Amino acid sequence: MRTNNMRGKFIVLEGLEGAGKTTAHQIILTQLKQAGIQQIVQTREPGGTPLAEKLRYLIKHEFEEPISPQAELLMLYAARAQLVENVIKPALSAGKWVLGDRHDMSSQAYQGGGRQLDVALLNSLKESVLGPFEPDLTIYLDIDPAIGLARASGCGELDRIEQQSLDFFYRTRERYLALTQHNEKAVIINAEQPLEKVTNDIQQAVQKFLTFAQ
């Protein structure tokens, strides 16, 4: 497949804690390189720039006072604005591909579903910060929250977000599914399957995307 004339594309991984995003990231990265795509910028949200990484710390850690859902949401969008304007858009304009660990769908699911913030507020912020900008492909790794959190708890200490109630994560998953089921630019992967099957499903989704991305 010819890939040297392909313009930059933005691929994003989404999913709950313990869904296997880190493993999936490496699977996709390897596949892109094997397809001849060598200029790949890797990002994560929140984070990805000096300021955004500081905001990530504020979002994920406990402080002397509770962090309100609205303050959390605004910090997430501040970090996202920095990353999109200073890293992602310049990379895409230069013909590079971007592989992201989370993007706006995370806020729609976690803050809209989990925190139950007003959808109109979320849509207004999204429009103000991102406008029509969106990933070319989103791969959502779907997993039962109880299974995902059990996996995540075995990987070290849980951060402030990961310590939310199980109901929080079930609401988040429900919103994720609502956002992805009828989204032509999104693919749902059953992350509860054996790793070999998950890997195959991810590779098939990426290959289909590459076929039409020329």
Curated annotation (Swiss-Prot):
GO (cellular component) term, any one: cytosol
EC number, as in UniProt: 2.7.4.9
GO molecular function: ATP binding; dTMP kinase activity
Pfam families per record: Thymidylate_kin
Biological processes, Gene Ontology terms: dTDP biosynthetic process; dTTP biosynthetic process; dUDP biosynthetic process
InterPro entries assigned: P-loop_NTPase (IPR027417), Thymidylate_kin-like_dom (IPR039430), Thymidylate_kin_CS (IPR018095), Thymidylate_kinase (IPR018094)
CDD domains linked: TMPK
Catalytic activity as recorded in UniProt: dTMP + ATP = dTDP + ADP
Keyword Kinase: yes
Binding-site residues, ATP: 15-22
Keywords: ATP-binding, Kinase, Nucleotide biosynthesis, Nucleotide-binding, Transferase
Role description: Phosphorylation of dTMP to form dTDP in both de novo and salvage pathways of dTTP synthesis.
HAMAP family: Thymidylate_kinase
Name the record gives this protein: Thymidylate kinase
Organism from which the protein derives: Haemophilus ducreyi (strain 35000HP / ATCC 700724)
Biological classification of the source: Bacteria, Pseudomonadati, Pseudomonadota, Gammaproteobacteria, Pasteurellales
Name of the gene: tmk
